[in-house]
């Protein structure tokens, strides 16, 4: 009996170690911002697809296949957030007045409520492009976040910038592997209209100074030679090529500092950075900032002003 108990204890210890090796994430991944992207209430097919598109933007640090049921509450997702290292909750809701988008810092807030002024799904954005970027490896790393014009008076602007920046992993410029930067999220704030434009791009690099024919061969693309008498004509007469590629202005040219996986980009030579839109597109307007998680003191409201703020405005006038 004693030997059986010892073997059972050893087996349980081995199982515990195995579970740790399977589920234990590296510390870098644990520290990276994770998110839940969900919807609440009744929404249409278009908005449901937008939820899926936004999850795609937030990959790989999001629950891409998260199932949301009517009986689920915000508390349910908060309870899951701790064990799964989730730091942000993104919620799409629809009502008679329009569509709202909430971003909350877990577990205690703050919460920012945006009005979704306009949006375009990824499939609509991609279908409008002549060249479509289809590469599953694009989503193996988090996107680079670029924010423009998030400056000015008001605590809410700084809160917006901080909230959006903290939704994505920080990048160490001196240690970053350029092969990991495959996507970019661009956010632009217009202080006059108070609107935020959200765009999502794929980033590619191509060698500079090569003819169209040579570039196709270097990048391992199989060229169509049916319209040419020989290979020389293909290489020396680029105007006959059907592909309307062009050399961008020198402002998009950079010197390659690292070895890149993409073909033709050699360290120390110039390459051109190209961006292809992936979608979705969002136009947002900040409506409200709450101190807590979907509740608490209202720190900012676009349409309802506190008495102190009204006094300050009257003094200025």
Q: What are the roles of these predicted feature ranges?
A:
Residues 1-317:
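Phospho-regulatory, Ser/Thr- and acidic-rich intrinsically disordered linkers and terminal tails
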């Amino acid at each position: 009996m004693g030997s059986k108990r010892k073997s059972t204890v050893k087996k349980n210890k081995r199982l515990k170690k195995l579970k740790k090796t399977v589920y234990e994430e590296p510390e870098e991944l644990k520290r990276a911002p994770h998110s839940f992207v969900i919807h609440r209430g009744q929404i249409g097919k278009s908005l449901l697809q937008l939820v899926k598109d936004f999850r795609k933007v937030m990959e790989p640090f999001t629950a891409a296949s998260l199932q949301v049921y009517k009986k689920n509450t915000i508390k349910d997702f908060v309870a899951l957030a701790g064990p799964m290292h989730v730091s942000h909750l993104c919620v799409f809701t629809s009502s008679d007045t329009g569509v709202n988008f909430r971003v909350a810092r877990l577990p205690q807030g703050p919460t920012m409520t945006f009005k979704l002024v306009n949006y375009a799904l990824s499939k609509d954005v991609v279908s409008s492009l002549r060249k479509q970027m289809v590469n599953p490896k694009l989503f193996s790393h988090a996107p680079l976040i670029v924010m423009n014009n998030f400056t000015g008076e008001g605590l809410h602007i700084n809160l917006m910038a901080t909230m959006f920046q903290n939704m994505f992993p920080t990048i160490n410029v001196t240690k970053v592997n350029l092969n990991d930067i495959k996507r970019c999220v661009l956010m632009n704030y217009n202080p006059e209209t108070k609107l935020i434009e959200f765009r999502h791009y794929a980033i590619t690099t191509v060698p500079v100074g090569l003819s169209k024919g040579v570039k196709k061969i270097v990048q391992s693309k199989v060229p169509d030679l049916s319209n040419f008498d020989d290979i020389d004509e293909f290489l020396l007469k680029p105007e006959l090529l059907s592909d309307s590629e062009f050399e961008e202005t020198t402002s998009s040219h950079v010197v390659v500092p690292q070895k890149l996986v993409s073909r033709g980009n050699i360290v120390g030579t110039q390459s051109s950075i190209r961006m292809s839109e992936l979608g979705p597109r969002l136009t947002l307007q900040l409506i409200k900032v709450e101190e807590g998680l979907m509740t608490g003191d209202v720190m900012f409201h676009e349409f309802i002003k506190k008495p102190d703020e009204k006094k300050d405005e009257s003094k200025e006038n």
